[in-house]
Curated annotation (Swiss-Prot):
Name recorded for this polypeptide: Beta-1,3-xylanase XYL4
Region (Carbohydrate binding module (CBM) 2) location: 487-574
Signal peptide as annotated in the record: 1-22
Protein's organism: Vibrio sp
Domain of life: Bacteria
Length: 576
């Protein structure tokens, strides 16, 4: 349903008088600005790892014609899109999803892809978290080949399908303009579907200085005139190289690059960027920063056939990173927290890892003499590590209370930082591939203010108190169990049950293991299984008809039992 919040608008640029008005839309925070990052899976992961934080929002893309990027990898040279992977990696973050018309907006408007629209909406709603749907993003961008009639008709249809499918409290519809300087002003109305069909107005913020901020200011005023919140859906310091500290005024080929100091770069692009949000604080409620090495992605790389973009990674320069962390730590920004979904107006707060937003910068930790343990980063951040003992390591996971993320190799160690609470007890675990086998170790630790937490009790890595608080049953995690066929009634030892077209339950019968820990995995996304009757089971978001690898692993005294298989998700129970 629509939510209306009172806001204040300045009566003039220098005036102190104000008038009350309202912002109308779905999933609009009462106060604050949602911080999200994009725009490909690996760039999001690199940002989260480099800054030691869980983003409040994560951004990715899908094509409507083939739904490429929805449930598997799709890369058109601009980085990997895989919404399923991103949603599973960040179960307690909002999703910001751009939907490309693939140049066929009129065919979309004619109804040719209505089945795909339903699949898309049902899949996104199945993740049970706030979803900001950027339908036909950059509606007026000439490179997209959109028609005003196709935009208007398709927007109205998608809005009505969201309601018809019962997803109106989960999916917010964003109408995003390109804010492209070469585009003449005064043309936005022809693309507008109507206020009743739009929740947010979005814009792109790349090089607004090229036209004295005219296009972004026009978009902001348009949102204000419609009483809609404003989302900076795509923003990046175009033509700047953060790592190399250069700038080019040439948008086509990036020629004649000028050297910049890190402070100059910040002052020229980042400071005006945040000032734009401050100047429009009555309507700005969210932004997505594209944190990517554009030059490393072949679509954007030399010879720059689609323009020169640069390198926007904030972690590529110490001052830029520090300034960024200090800025978004301010009170007006909405970072990741256990109340994030509630803050965004979602129906429940969800579960999973309890973030506290950006943890700020830290000095590189000193290597420890012990093989496996933790080190204190801050009162709310723990770093779990294991020394690299030369495994083949096709994959590795570092875990805190069952939340397992891929570790980074730093200073001869696999490391990963997590949100944590000083004084709490946690289960930490490390697992890594080693040829045809794997190495797994875990212990229980109490998080204290010291660099190398060596005191730990061996045992189940998922038995601590804290960290992942009920992520299996919350709105941000996987879907829990319940309903459908009881796995104990199945003749198969290991398989899956159909729960719905978007939910699969993986199970394995209990064969009498000691089982101080167990994990059930879907495509290498591993979480502790629930013991129900004589079976271990776990539900995941999935898409009917798709292929998956399912895995079960369990501790058995001093050893472990592991089994896996490839399956196609069909509408059946007790599938082997």
């Amino acid at each position: 349903m629509k939510r209306t919040y009172l806001s204040l608008i300045a009566a003039g640029v220098m005036s102190l008088s104000v008038s009350a008005w309202s912002l109308d839309g779905v999933l609009v925070p009462e106060s604050g600005i949602l911080v999200s990052v994009g725009q490909d899976v690996d760039s999001v992961n690199d940002y989260a790892s480099a800054l030691g934080t869980i983003p409040a929002g994560v951004t990715n893309y899908v094509g409507i014609v083939n739904l490429d990027g929805l449930n598997s990898d799709a890369d058109a040279g601009a980085g990997r899109n895989n919404i399923a992977e991103l949603a599973n990696a960040y179960p307690t973050s909002a999703l910001v999803v751009g939907v490309s018309m693939n140049g066929e907006v009129d065919a979309v408007a004619s109804g040719r892809y209505n089945a795909n629209i339903d699949t898309l909406l049902n899949t996104l709603a199945g993740y049970d978290r706030p979803v900001y749907l950027r339908w036909a993003y950059e509606v007026d961008g000439p490179w997209n080949g959109h028609s005003p009639s196709g935009i208007v008709t398709s927007f109205q249809y998608v809005h009505d399908r969201i309601i018809a499918l019962g997803h109106q409290a989960k999916i917010s519809l964003v109408w995003q303009v390109a804010s492209y300087c070469p585009t003449p002003g005064g043309q936005l109305d022809q693309w507008w579907p109507g206020s009743e069909y739009v929740d947010w107005v979005g814009l792109s913020y790349f090089a607004p200085q090229d036209c004295n901020w005219d296009r972004v200011n026009e978009a902001a005023q348009f949102a204000r005139s419609k009483g809609k919140p404003l989302f900076l859906n795509e923003s990046t310091p175009q033509r700047y190289q953060v790592a190399d500290l250069t700038y080019s005024a040439d948008p086509a080929k990036g020629t004649n690059r000028q050297s910049k100091t890190s402070q100059q770069l910040w002052d020229e692009w980042f400071a005006p960027y945040f000032q734009f949000m401050s100047d429009n604080s009555d309507i700005v409620k969210g932004f997505t920063y594209i944190n990517a090495d554009w030059d490393s992605q072949w679509r954007w790389a030399a010879p720059y056939n689609e323009g020169y973009w640069g390198d926007s990674r904030v972690q590529a320069n110490a001052l830029i990173k520090s300034n960024w962390q200090q800025e978004i730590a301010k009170g007006q920004y909405i970072n990741h927290s256990e109340t994030l979904f509630e803050t965004l107006g979602y129906g429940s707060t969800g579960g999973g890892d309890n973030g506290g937003g950006d943890n700020g910068g830290t000095n590189p930790p000193e290597p420890c003499n012990e093989e496996f343990g933790y080190r204190y980063v801050s009162d709310s951040t723990i770093e779990v590590f294991h020394k690299n003992n030369g495994w083949s390591a096709e994959w590795n996971y570092v875990c805190l209370n069952g939340l397992c993320l891929q570790g980074e190799i730093k200073n001869g160690e696999y490391v990963k930082q997590f949100d944590a609470q000083l004084g709490s007890t946690y289960g930490i675990e490390f697992k890594v591939a080693d040829g045809e086998s794997q190495f797994i170790t875990d212990k229980s630790v109490t998080f204290e203010n010291k660099q190398c937490g060596s005191t730990g009790t061996p045992g189940g890595g998922d038995n601590g108190s804290g960290g992942d608080n009920g992520g299996d049953n919350g709105s941000g995690g996987d879907n829990g169990s319940g309903g459908g066929t009881d796995p104990s009634q199945c003749s198969a030892d290991f398989g899956y049950n159909y729960r719905s077209d978007t939910e699969i339950e993986v199970f394995h019968k209990d064969l009498g293991w000691s089982a101080s820990w167990n994990y059930i995995c879907l495509d290498d996304y591993c979480v502790p299984g629930d013991k129900s009757g004589d079976s271990y089971n776990r539900s995941f978001n999935a898409t009917l008809g798709s292929d998956y690898k399912i895995t079960f692993k369990v501790e058995d005294s001093a050893s472990q039992f592991i089994t896996e298989k490839n399956i196609t998700f069909v509408n059946t129970s007790c599938a082997q």
